[in-house]
């Protein structure tokens, strides 16, 4: 599943909805306090797309900004099914290593080896899991 955390840049949303569903699953947009439990399979990978930096992801401008701890709370409260064993890929600029390390710390050790981010500026197109751009959170 792709989960889009950008509400002010239509190009991010557009790219999310144009990704190959056989690789990435269906795309959903984040709405505050809206449950997406049931959309993500227990073993399905989760691809998060947004604008980002080493401290936050979300909108390009103001209005939606999530620290790693805030994203972890959203994911555990509204997205991840019980017993989730898939991987989480944060496709946003500069999310590795600091942001995804914070996300791993917030989600806990059960997620070790399953959270990835990106170094530097990235293109809007989400890359498949085996792409060399993904950096594992440590």
Model-derived regions, located:
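A cross-taxonomic marker for long C-terminal extensions/tails that follow the last structured domain
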Residues: 124-138
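A domain-level signal for caspase-like cysteine endopeptidase catalytic cores
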Residues: 1-40, 67, 91
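Hydrophobic transmembrane signal anchors and adjacent membrane-proximal interface regions, especially
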Residues: 29, 37-38, 77-78, 84, ...
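Catalytic cores of nucleophile-dependent amide-cleaving enzymes
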Residues: 45-128
């Amino acid at each position: 599943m792709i989960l889009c955390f950008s509400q002010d840049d239509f190009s991010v949303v557009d790219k999310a909805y144009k990704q190959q569903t056989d690789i990435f699953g269906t795309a959903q947009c984040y709405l505050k306090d809206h449950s997406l439990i049931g959309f993500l399979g227990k073993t399905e990978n989760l691809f998060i797309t947004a604008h980002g930096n080493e401290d936050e992801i979300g909108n390009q401008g103001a209005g939606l900004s999530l620290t790693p701890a805030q994203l972890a709370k959203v994911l555990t409260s509204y997205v991840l099914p019980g017993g989730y064993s898939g991987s989480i890929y944060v496709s946003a600029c500069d999310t590795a290593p600091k942001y995804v390390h914070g996300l791993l710390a917030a989600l806990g050790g059960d997620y070790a080896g399953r959270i990835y981010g990106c170094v530097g500026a990235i293109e809007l197109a989400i890359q498949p899991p085996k792409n060399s751009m993904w950096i594992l959170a440590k």
